[in-house]
Amino acid sequence: MKIIKSILPYGFVSGKSNFSFKKFIKNFLPFGIVAAVNKRNADKRYTVEYLKSTYVSDLTDNEKWLLLAVLLYLERTQKNTEYLEVGIYAGGTIKFMKENSKNSNFTGVDLFEDFKPSDDNTHFWKNYTQAQVWESLGKDRVTLLKGFSVQCLKNLQEKNKLFDLVFIDGNHTYKATKEDFEASLPLIRKNGYVAFHNCSPGASEEDKYYIKLDGGPWMLTHELLGNPNFKLVSSIDRVRVFQKLD
């Protein structure tokens, strides 16, 4: 697949610091792009109005541009594109992707208000409710599933669902990330893509913590580098994107 040569000719794979995602997206999109505003504000209340006003996400701008670029490439090559996100928190990443795409459908999996902190889960902050996130995103082109990720993924498999791009951003222990990845595998189309968050050894203190804990997402993606069935497409900030080859 000629994703790099066709739409990413500016050092996309290497993640060079002089590469401007914002400039690239504006030049590439015929219908424009909405500037991402994704910095958290601890003083803001957990309201639907706040969710509608911004992109509540812990992804950097570059990370969102990267996922969007892959999604838009897929939109160019097929009629409908299916995106799956495991661990959506407030839905900010899906909101960003939805507002800047035309022919993609989005499925998000999360525990939402049912989440309870535990020793084996790296998440600990307050979660939005499923109703809040759905009202913020709108139900057009969006499906939200509440429950434990592996079980939700199995349910999707039973319904013969397939996805073109899967983004795994749930529990960041190695064990949980691997379980989410393995449960997602049957859902990824041939030549589809799977992306992981928090898998850079030096990008943030969070990532360093996950690696020290049990290897975290970084260890799993490092293992995929040696897997002949997957090809690393890009690594930007804390996100790595792989293409499924078989």
Question: Positions of the model-derived regions?
Answer:
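N-terminal pre-P-loop "Q-motif" helix
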Residues: 63-66
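Membrane-proximal basic amphipathic "stem/tether" segments
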Residues: 1-56
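S-adenosylmethionine/decaboxylated-SAM
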Residues: 44-58, 69-246
